[in-house]
Amino acid sequence: LIHSAEINQLDPNTKYYYRVKTETETSSLYTFITESNSSDEVAINIIAMSDMQQDSNFPNKFNEINNAIIDYFNQNYFGDLNESLDLVLIPGDLVSSGNNYNHWRDHFFSQSKELFSSVPFYPVLGNHEENSELYFKYMDLPKNGTRGYKEHWWYKDNSNVRIIGLNSNDQFRISEQLNWLDSLLNSTINDEDIDFVFAQLHHPHHSELWTPGNTSFTGKIISLLEEFTETSNKPSIHFYGHTHGYSRGESRDHEHLMINVATAGGAIDYWGDWPQHDYEEYSISEDEWGYVLVQVTAG
């Protein structure tokens, strides 16, 4: 069971302290920091990680990844975690079965509570969420997508970055989503507050470690992002998961990057275990657990 509360009239880029109380319990004291206005433009740090659905051979791997993130920021930055880490992106497969309450409680929330008690996260649906009611109950995402598909695709701005969440699952590979994205990107071209576009979706277009996961719909998304980047001269990235490993590449003729953000808990897709391919747009692929840190500089 997750409760939510809406707090209004908060100032931007401000630290707030909070506790959670029930009739019988009171939590420890936590903090969060509100986002800056896009027009104020500040440097931000973003973590991206995906596919933390539990591997029975390493059931606490997601907790290890979360602790590694916290340790990294403690060692390399001063102050509280949320003073140096602004948000976390998750391109799908948060749990093994989105319809299983215990998976949400035991495999996801309990293993990430130290991180997500102070830093917001923004996921998109993977195939393992199964379009479940529990996902939509637990998440509170921007509701600015196509009418009838709210929280399936959405966008939000943080500093000079526009973050776009998409749904690449079978039944949502539809023209409504592509048209919405095309319109949004067109409106972003001349937005002086936005310098970068980061999109996230679950399925790859090309996967070097696991080619059965390749999805032509993602290729259409990439084409729209490449066209946007060419027209606007604003770099774009798409983050994805589905393949349990890390890959990084760049479109040949465009300032568009593609990053498989590595599995944060699911079983690794090892070299030699699956159909695989060496695609020219990729510079590196590794069969490892991990996460990605993106540092965005103001200006």
Give a label for each model feature.
Residues V42-V124, E129:
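Conserved, compact domain cores that house catalytic/ligand-binding motifs in diverse enzymes
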Residues L1, A48-D71, G98, K137-T146, ...:
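Acidic/histidine-rich helix-loop elements
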Residues L1-P59, D71, Q75, G79-N82, ...:
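Acidic, histidine-bearing metal-coordination/catalytic regions of metal-dependent phosphoesterases
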Residues M52, A199-H205, H238-R248:
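Histidine-centered catalytic micro-motifs
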Residues I90-V95, T188-W210:
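Short acidic, glycine-rich surface-loop motifs adjacent to enzyme active sites
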Residues D86, D195-V197, S236:
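Conserved acidic residues
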Residues K15-T31, N102-D193, P212, S216-I237, ...:
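Extended active-site neighborhood of metal-dependent phosphoesterases/phosphodiesterases
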Residues V42-S56, N160-D170, F198-H202, H256-T263:
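Active-site-proximal beta-strand elements of phosphoester/diester hydrolases
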